[in-house]
């Protein structure tokens, strides 16, 4: 089960999710139908040596093309939407228009669907980065619970492992017998981990030399994190090419705001060293609850943080899948149909 316990990691996940939703909204609903495609045009009557000019659909000009004869013998993926607004050249009643109208009649030689480029580059990179960051969060939480962590106050007690609690509930309710093997195993693991953390903080180089597997695990965790953040930040640096003329200014501003905020948040999380907690004896409450109320409180907290969170994740994933399946045809129609 994945539960984002760190507020810093949760903020990054929320920012990446919001960034992806903004891109999906613009791709599906926000783009004007006249600003979806760009065309490589040349004014009618000019020589074939004249350089092609990329422009978006302009209602003051007449675009001539050949929608029934795809370029290079076949359509590009979803390129038919770009040729839908063109006029077939053979229906124009004159072969060579007057000089006064030459500059208002354009021959289209190529068309590009810019929403297709946005959908298959930026949106995909954001989705991959989102899953990679969740993978990093899962690896980091497992390392905090079972692995070597420095500083030591970041460690999470292995006894809080959900499988341990579930095993005790099943054994006590159904088997009517206390099951403590997992608890004893986790206690032994906690003691051994304390010793490893002390050795690591004393001499990290020698520790990693004699235990390279731990270094590989930590390295994989860091690589996954940097790759995820790199993919998200890299979406702002993808060359837009000629499609830049179709993207509005607010999309550029929104992209840089999200990317810079995510990058600065991750940089702050890496550089920030949280203060060590106060002494447990001083921080402990003088009147710690005991008896039935304490047991019920601990059980309720474990249930809410474990089973309830699992149900929430299942509900969210199921909701996303149902919405995607329900609106799949509508999204495809808005993206790639006329």
From Swiss-Prot:
Swiss-Prot/TrEMBL GO biological process terms: fusion of viral membrane with host outer nuclear membrane; symbiont-mediated induction of syncytium formation
Look up and give the membrane topology term: Multi-pass membrane protein
**What's in the keyword line of the UniProt record?**
Glycoprotein, Host cell membrane, Host endosome, Host Golgi apparatus, Host membrane, Membrane, Signal, Syncytium formation induced by viral infection, Transmembrane, Transmembrane helix, Viral primary envelope fusion with host outer nuclear membrane, Viral release from host cell
Q: Which residues form the signal peptide?
A: 1-30
- Region annotation (Involved in fusion) maps to 31-121
Q: Where is this region: Interaction with UL20?
A: 265-301
Residues bearing glycans:
48, 58
Q: Where are the transmembrane segments?
A: 122-140, 213-233, 244-264, 302-322
* InterPro entries linked: GK
Q: Which superkingdom, per the lineage?
A: Viruses
Keyword Transferase listed? The answer is no
Task: Provide the record's note on post-translational modification.
Answer: N-glycosylated.
Q: Which ranges does the record list as Cytoplasmic topological domains?
A: 141-212, 265-301
Q: Name one GO cellular component term.
A: host cell plasma membrane
Subcellular localization is given as:
Host cell membrane; Host endosome membrane; Host Golgi apparatus membrane
Keyword Transport set for record? no
Q: Which residue ranges does the entry give as Extracellular-facing topology?
A: 31-121, 234-243, 323-338
State the protein's purpose: Glycoprotein that probably modulates membrane fusion events during secondary envelopment of cytoplasmic capsids that bud into specific trans-Golgi network (TGN)-derived membranes. Also plays a role, together with gB, in virus-induced cell-to-cell fusion (syncytia formation). Seems to block fusion of virions with infected-cell membranes.
Assembly description: Interacts (via UL20 interaction region) with protein UL20 (via N-terminus); this interaction probably plays a role in the coordinate transport of protein UL20 and gK to the trans-Golgi network (TGN), and is required for the cell surface expression of gK.
Family stated for the protein in its record? Belongs to the alphaherpesvirinae glycoprotein K family.
Q: What is this protein called?
A: Envelope glycoprotein K
Which organism does this sequence originate in?
A: Human herpesvirus 1 (strain KOS)
């Amino acid at each position: 089960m994945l539960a984002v316990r760190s507020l810093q990691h949760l903020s990054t996940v929320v920012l990446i999710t919001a960034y992806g939703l903004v891109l999906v909204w613009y791709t599906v609903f926000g783009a004007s139908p006249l600003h979806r495609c760009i065309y490589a045009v040349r004014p009618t009557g000019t020589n074939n040596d004249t350089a092609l000019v990329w422009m978006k659909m302009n209602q003051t000009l007449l675009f001539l093309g050949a929608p029934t004869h795809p370029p290079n013998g076949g359509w590009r993926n979803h390129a038919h939407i770009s040729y839908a607004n063109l006029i077939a050249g053979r229906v124009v009643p004159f072969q060579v228009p007057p000089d006064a109208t030459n500059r208002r009649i354009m021959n289209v030689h190529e068309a590009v669907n810019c929403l297709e480029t946005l959908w298959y580059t930026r949106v995909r990179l954001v989705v991959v980065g989102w899953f990679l960051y969740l993978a990093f969060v899962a690896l980091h939480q497992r390392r905090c619970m079972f692995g070597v962590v420095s500083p030591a106050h970041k460690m999470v007690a292995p006894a809080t492992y959900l499988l341990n609690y579930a095993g005790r509930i099943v054994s006590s309710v159904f088997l009517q017998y206390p099951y403590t093997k997992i608890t004893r195993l986790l206690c032994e693991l906690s003691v051994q981990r304390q010793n490893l953390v002390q050795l690591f903080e004393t001499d990290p180089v020698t520790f990693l030399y004699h235990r390279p597997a731990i270094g590989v695990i930590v390295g994989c965790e860091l690589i996954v994190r940097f790759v995820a953040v790199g993919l998200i930040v890299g979406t702002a640096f993808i060359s837009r090419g000629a499609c830049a003329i179709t993207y509005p200014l607010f999309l550029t501003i929104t992209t840089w705001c999200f990317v810079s905020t995510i990058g600065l948040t991750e940089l702050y999380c890496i550089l920030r060293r949280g203060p060590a907690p106060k002494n447990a004896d001083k921080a402990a409450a003088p009147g710690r609850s005991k008896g039935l109320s304490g047991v019920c409180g601990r059980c309720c907290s474990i249930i809410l943080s474990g089973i309830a969170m699992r149900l929430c994740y299942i509900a969210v994933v199921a909701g996303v899948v149902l919405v995607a399946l329900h609106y799949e045809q509508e999204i495809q129609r808005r993206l790639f149909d006329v």
